[in-house]
């Protein structure tokens, strides 16, 4: 028995993961959540259908705010069909919303990639597309990761205007290097457009990170990776995240991008609501067959993806349900792990109608057992059995 269910409905809402409860859905919304006592007393109308979750956990659907691809489909295909296929695949892994993430690329390719996502929005048959994450091109050439130096651009507001025009208001978040010349002006401009700015692929000093915070660069892309290291004489970008409680950060919980001990240490230093689980997965993640090519590079898989030419980490092979499972294996509670996968990204990306199992929130849920097997994923009230085929009851 989940002891919280006997303490009244308020305690149910405070939990990220629930059992011994009932969730009432109507159309696209959550109408009510019942503990056992209220459920037993409730007289439901005859048209209410009941689905027995057989003791599994019910949690808010996962929100992946940094994902390049999955199942052989990715943003580097420059195709709305690939984005729509990602939408169909992702419920298998508990994802109900995602933000397709674009690499730096020459201008015309970036515009093509942006238009592909825009064309897919509203036509999804699975996970919802929240918008677009631009991971460049205003990033540091000294912290590229596997991005191409030829694809970078000096800070250019006119170029940003072209991106904004192509995106038709759908750019949600953007990774930038705070130390770049003219970044202050660009940051203020982007903030005025409602874009969440993230420090990433950056060689910023601690002081430059603080300057970035002053213009609302308050989120961080894949913490520890592709950014200036923490040193006792210069805390760098990583140190700034640890020192300033207002800074939030993405975490790739595959055990490779960040040592699990550092994730536990981070939890002792940061408020939990500032930590966001992401996959940063490549199109080669769960790819059924064929050569492993991502963003034009041949990659190989060894727990995560590495570029074959120089063995540089290229991205993760993680899914969100695997990330949640890993966080629990690292020592986090299930509630903490799910909050990092749902409520926290919803809050930081300003999507307050997502990320909680409570009345008025979108009917986006994931149902999984103690072994992290997904039984159902529910997107806007549509039920996917084992996250795959939409089903009716």
What are these model-derived regions, one by one?
Residues 1-13:
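Single conserved hydrophobic/aromatic residue that forms the stacking wall/gate
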Residues 68, 84-113, 127-140, 167-179, ...:
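Divalent metal-dependent hydrolysis catalytic cores, especially in the metallo-beta-lactamase
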Residues 88-99, 140-168, 210-223, 234, ...:
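Active-site gating loops and adjacent loop-to-helix segments of metal-dependent hydrolytic enzymes
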Residues 161, 165-287:
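Active-site core of metal-dependent hydrolases
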Residues 347, 357-393:
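C-terminal cap of metal-dependent C-N hydrolases
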């Amino acid at each position: 028995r989940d002891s919280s269910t006997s303490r009244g409905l308020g305690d149910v809402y405070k939990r990220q993961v629930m059992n011994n409860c009932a969730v009432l859905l109507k159309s696209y919304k959550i109408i009510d959540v019942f503990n056992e006592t209220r459920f037993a007393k409730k007289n439901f109308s005859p048209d209410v259908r009941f689905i027995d979750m057989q003791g599994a956990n019910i949690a808010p659907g996962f929100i992946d705010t940094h994902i390049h691809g999955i199942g052989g489909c990715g943003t580097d295909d420059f195709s709305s069909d690939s984005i729509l296929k990602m939408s169909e695949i992702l419920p298998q892994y508990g994802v109900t919303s995602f933000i397709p993430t674009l690499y730096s690329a020459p201008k015309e390719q970036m515009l093509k990639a942006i238009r592909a996502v825009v064309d897919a929005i509203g036509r999804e048959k699975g996970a919802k597309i929240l918008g677009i994450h631009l991971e460049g091109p205003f990033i540091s050439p000294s912290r590229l990761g596997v991005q191409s130096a030829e694809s970078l651009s000096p800070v250019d507001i006119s170029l940003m205007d072209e991106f904004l025009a192509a995106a038709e208001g759908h750019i949600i978040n953007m990774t930038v290097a705070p130390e770049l010349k003219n970044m202050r002006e660009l940051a203020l401009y982007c903030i005025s457009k409602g874009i969440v700015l993230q420090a990433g692929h950056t060689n910023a000093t601690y002081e430059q990170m603080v300057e970035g915070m002053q213009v609302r660069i308050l989120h961080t892309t894949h913490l520890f990776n592709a950014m200036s290291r923490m040193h006792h004489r210069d805390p760098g970008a990583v140190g700034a995240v640890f020192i300033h409680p207002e800074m939030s950060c993405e975490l790739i919980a595959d055990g490779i991008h960040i040592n699990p001990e550092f994730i536990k240490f981070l939890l002792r230093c940061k408020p939990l609501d500032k930590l966001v689980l992401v996959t940063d997965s490549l199109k080669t993640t769960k790819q059924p067959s064929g050569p492993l090519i991502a963003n034009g590079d041949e990659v190989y898989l060894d727990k995560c993806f590495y570029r074959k030419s120089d063995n540089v980490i290229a991205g993760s092979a993680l899914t969100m349900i695997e990330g949640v499972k890993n966080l629990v294996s690292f020592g986090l509670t299930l509630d903490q792990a799910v909050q990092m996968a749902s409520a926290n990204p919803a809050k930081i990306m300003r999507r307050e109608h997502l990320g909680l199992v409570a009345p008025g929130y979108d009917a986006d849920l994931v149902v999984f057992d103690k072994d992290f097997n997904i039984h159902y994923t529910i997107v806007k009230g549509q039920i996917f059995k084992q996250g795959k085929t939409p089903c009716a009851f």
